[in-house]
């Protein structure tokens, strides 16, 4: 995490994990979020115009939640289409 590069935000009203990075060609943002029945991923230039329906579908789902916890942990909770709740944590390096 480069000084706030990982955050929780909203994208068209959808809760999303946002990961920002600076490349030679500019600043880019990656969003992981739930929209219209799917967990989605969207990678865009920070100067682009985009919407939640622009993201690539990853897996079918019925709900998604993300939270940044202490000790550099991100908590993901995904409810699948069978209404089974799956929770996992991802650690990141500061």
Which residue ranges define each predicted feature?
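Membrane-proximal N-terminal amphipathic helix
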Residues: 1-10
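Residue-identity detector for threonine
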Residues: 9-10, 21, 25, 77-81, ...
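Type IV pilin-like appendage domain
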Residues: 13, 17-73
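Low-complexity, S/T/G/P-rich flexible repeat/linker segments used as non-globular hinges
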Residues: 68-94
């Amino acid at each position: 995490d480069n000084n706030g590069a990982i955050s929780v935000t909203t994208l068209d009203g959808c809760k999303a994990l946002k990961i920002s990075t600076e490349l030679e060609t500019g600043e880019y943002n990656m969003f992981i979020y739930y929209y219209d029945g799917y967990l989605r991923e969207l990678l865009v230039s920070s100067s682009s115009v985009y919407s939640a329906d622009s993201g690539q579908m990853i897996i079918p789902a019925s709900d998604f939640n993300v939270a940044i916890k202490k000790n550099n942990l991100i908590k993901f909770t995904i409810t699948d289409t069978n209404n089974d709740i799956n929770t996992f944590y991802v650690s990141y390096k500061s």
